Amino acid sequence: MEILVIDGQGGGLGRQLVAAVKKAVPQAVVTAIGTNSAATSAMLKAGADRAATGENAVVVNCRTADIIVGPIGIVIADALLGEITPAMATAVCQSSATRVLIPVNHCENYIVGVPDQPIGCLLYTSPSPRDKR
């Protein structure tokens, strides 16, 4: 199973996601794609099997992923303070992969019905990649 974790900024959420996925599904191949080198480095240190940085890396890896995990901003062009390009958002949305999106209320995007919670709490309520069937 190919699991793609996408994150930007400092990679803090991505780091937590990589660690959680590796623990929940140790046999999965986890690819970390950062919108910048800091995010990529944080996810690689958390145990990603492989990593890359930038727009083209997102576009290429969305083609082969079984599951894509990241903050909801990865499907919104110009989110994450402009780090998500329209091409990145389109690649995530058009991928045949199952998307597991973490509801983060930042950058003028608010998810109605989702209270502000610490990221750790959200990770425990996220579906496991094993739930994909």
Predicted features and spans:
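Short glycine-rich or small-residue beta-strand-to-loop segments that form or flank ligand, phosphate
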Residues: 2-7, 68-75, 100
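Glycine-rich phosphate-binding loop
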Residues: 50-88
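Single conserved hydrophobic/aromatic residue that forms the stacking wall/gate
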Residues: 124-133
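Glycine-rich phosphate/diphosphate-binding loop of Rossmann-like nucleotide-binding domains
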Residues: 4-34
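N-terminal beta-loop-helix "entrance" segment that forms/cooperates
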Residues: 33-52
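Ser/Thr/Gly-rich flexible loops in soluble cytosolic domains mediating phosphotransfer, phosphorylation
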Residues: 84, 89-123
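Short, ordered loop/turn segments at secondary-structure junctions
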Residues: 8, 35-38, 56, 74, ...
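Hydrophobic/aromatic beta-strand patches that form the interior of the parallel beta-sheet core
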Residues: 31, 52, 98-102
